Amino acid sequence: MTLKKLSYRLAAASALSFFVTSNAFAATEIQWWHAMTGANNEVVDTLAKEFNDSQKDYKITPVFKGTYPETLNAGIAAFRAKQPPAIIQVFDAGSGVMMGAAGAIKPVADVLKEGGYTFNKDEYLAGIVAYYSKPDGTMLSFPYNSSSPILYYNKDIFQKAGLDAANPPKTWPEVFEAAKKIKTSGAAQCGFTSTWLTWIQTENFAAWNNVSYGSNENGLGGTDVKLAVNAPLFVEHFQAIADLAKDGTFRYGGRTSEAKQLFMSGECGILTESSGGLGDIVKTGMNYGIGQLPYYEGHGPQNTIPGGASLWVFGGKSDAEYKGVAEFFHFLSQTKIQSRLHQVSGYMPVTIAAYEETKKSGFYDKNPARETPLLQMMGKPPTENSKGVRLVNLPQVRDIMNEEFEAMLAGKQDAKAALDKIVERGDAAIKQAAGN
């Protein structure tokens, strides 16, 4: 062999060795599709960076995919194209959709077990675990940003309107009267607004007031569900909102979280919104207060049901990716991470240890209202009306509701007509989706 040939072979061997070594030590990339915006998007990026910096084997890559419904639809499309991410954040309404796609997902309990971690559901808050588990108790998804709807109010606007800024309204009639006073006094352009008329004013309204949303325990007992949201209490509530909308005392912001901007801008004095919206409200520097979700005397308060979203794992991934997912979920479960996530975002800690650590630190003593979402959810044992809502097509049913609510708020129909149409259209859609 000539010296020249030997030189070529040594160079080739060296290059091959470098290629193999580089690939052997390359971090396994794990895509995490999510729907977080604003302050909560910053939290996502921070968590990914902290996990990536803590080890060298795996790299979490967060990818923003739009609103909650847009992210779910993107995930479904990616699965059909055989290119899904390893992890996808799915909002509460999409849980039934994911549970119905058994072959598409890998239960998080299995991911953790195969990754070498013992999953003990007793370490997690019971109400949250139950919402994301099969009837046999198998945990299907990882509860990332669980939330509860609460009332926010602008203390400065309350003072201008002659309202007691230290005592937010507790019942819905009190909210409506306060909203009227804010409007008529000129303290703000609008008295009251709400995000998520479906999740807050319908699903949680039913649970918090202990009235039925639908048959079969709101879908938790089976897929054959008949909606019950045209019952008298719903009609009374939505007619009150429709009446307030006529002169702008109630202002509609949109189907999801858009109304939060009406509150943060000072346009509206009262807002019902997810506890997870706290981060953005804090960033405005406004003088805000927090109260529990309002209720009707003689009905509530019972308990709220979790909102927010959980992290689902798609099937068909490599062992290395699943190991990385298990490591990431273990990282997220750490008490210090959960405590911090709760304190900076307003989302609820998913583990009992994180809740107890936050309580022990004195955080709630300094910020008593921040415990409100947890106390609402854990205050009473759930009834068949308040365990949750699980429909195979809940996003579709929410769309139907939003269409009818928007027609109602535009003055095209009253609350009774809107709710009757929701039941008629919703029942037909559920029957078709469930194959009954």
Swiss-Prot record:
Principal subcellular localisation of the protein: periplasm
Gene3D superfamilies documented for this protein: Periplasmic binding protein-like II
InterPro entries registered for this protein in UniProt: Bact_solute-bd_prot1, SBP
First and last residue of the signal peptide: 1-26
Domain of life, source organism: Bacteria
Binding site for sn-glycerol 3-phosphate: Y68, D92, S147, S274, G308, Y347, R398
Transmembrane segments: none
GO CC aspect terms: periplasmic space
Keywords assigned by UniProt, alphabetized: Periplasm, Signal, Transport
Cell location: Periplasm
Role: Part of the ABC transporter complex UgpBAEC involved in sn-glycerol-3-phosphate (G3P) import. Binds G3P.
Assembly description: The complex is composed of two ATP-binding proteins (UgpC), two transmembrane proteins (UgpA and UgpE) and a solute-binding protein (UgpB).
Family label: Belongs to the bacterial solute-binding protein 1 family.
Protein name: sn-glycerol-3-phosphate-binding periplasmic protein UgpB
Gene name, Swiss-Prot/TrEMBL: ugpB
